[in-house]
């Protein structure tokens, strides 16, 4: 393990060992221990009591963070010509179809989200091996395959994110920036936690939310009390 810097040691010392923090206290503390010279991302990791290998225990969905992510989401709209103006007006960063499909085939994936139309999905199939591992494949369940292209782009730009439990049963999500007020960090975290609770699979047994950790790009993780969120 790499040696901790002086600032990182100071940050660790401010976190009480074995303590489970309330979401409110953790949101204040995460700002106090941040030491980087850039605006760090604030992330949440929620360990769920599910077996994601089983289809009836897969947890995925979307959430509109009340205060956005603080990140400028780069959106590619893969649409037919009749939808291009709608996508551009909504703020899509890249708009088109065949030219961008070719760029992706050539290895270009410099975007955060891709939205498209049902009629175009057939063309994206062969690109699954490129887009899939990067989490960029559009999906009707997350609202990125739709005829309402303008609405989809607007929502993403406003802070709508999609999430999916990984193979270890953890949901990771970026929920803001360290420059956010503690209340905004808390409210964004609360929104995604409540969304996860609503999505609890009926097949999931035992404790559903096993642990929650709040962290920033360069800081150690703060353990939250799942009962105090």
From Swiss-Prot:
Keywords: Repressor, Ribonucleoprotein, Ribosomal protein, RNA-binding, rRNA-binding, Translation regulation, tRNA-binding. Pfam families: Ribosomal_L1 (PF00687). One of its GO terms (cellular component) is large ribosomal subunit. It comes from the Bacteria. GO terms for molecular function: rRNA binding; structural constituent of ribosome; tRNA binding. The keyword rRNA-binding applies. Belongs to the universal ribosomal protein uL1 family. PANTHER family: 54S RIBOSOMAL PROTEIN L1, MITOCHONDRIAL, LARGE RIBOSOMAL SUBUNIT PROTEIN UL1M. Binds directly to 23S rRNA. The L1 stalk is quite mobile in the ribosome, and is involved in E site tRNA release. Part of the 50S ribosomal subunit. This is Large ribosomal subunit protein uL1.
């Amino acid at each position: 393990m790499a040696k901790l810097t002086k600032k990182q040691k100071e940050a660790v010392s401010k976190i009480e060992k074995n303590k489970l923090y309330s979401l409110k206290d953790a949101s204040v503390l995460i700002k106090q221990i941040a030491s980087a010279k850039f605006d760090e991302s604030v992330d949440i990791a929620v360990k769920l009591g599910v077996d994601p290998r089983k289809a009836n225990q897969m947890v995925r969905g979307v959430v509109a963070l009340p205060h956005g992510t603080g990140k400028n989401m780069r959106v590619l709209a893969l649409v037919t010509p009749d939808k291009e103006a709608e996508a551009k007006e909504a703020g899509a960063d890249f708009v088109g179809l065949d030219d961008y499909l070719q760029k992706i085939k050539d290895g270009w994936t410099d975007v955060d989200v891709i939205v498209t139309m049902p009629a175009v999905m057939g063309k994206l199939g062969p690109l699954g091996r490129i887009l899939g591992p990067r989490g960029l494949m559009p999906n009707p369940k997350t609202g990125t395959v739709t005829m309402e292209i303008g609405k989809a782009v607007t929502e993403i730009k406003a802070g709508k994110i999609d999430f999916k439990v990984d193979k270890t049963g953890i949901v990771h999500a970026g929920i803001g920036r360290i420059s956010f007020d503690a209340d905004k960090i808390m409210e964004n975290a609360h929104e995604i936690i409540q969304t996860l609770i609503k999505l609890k699979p009926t097949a999931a047994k035992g404790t559903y939310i096993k642990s929650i950790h709040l962290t920033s790009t360069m800081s150690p993780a703060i353990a939250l009390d799942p009962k105090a969120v």
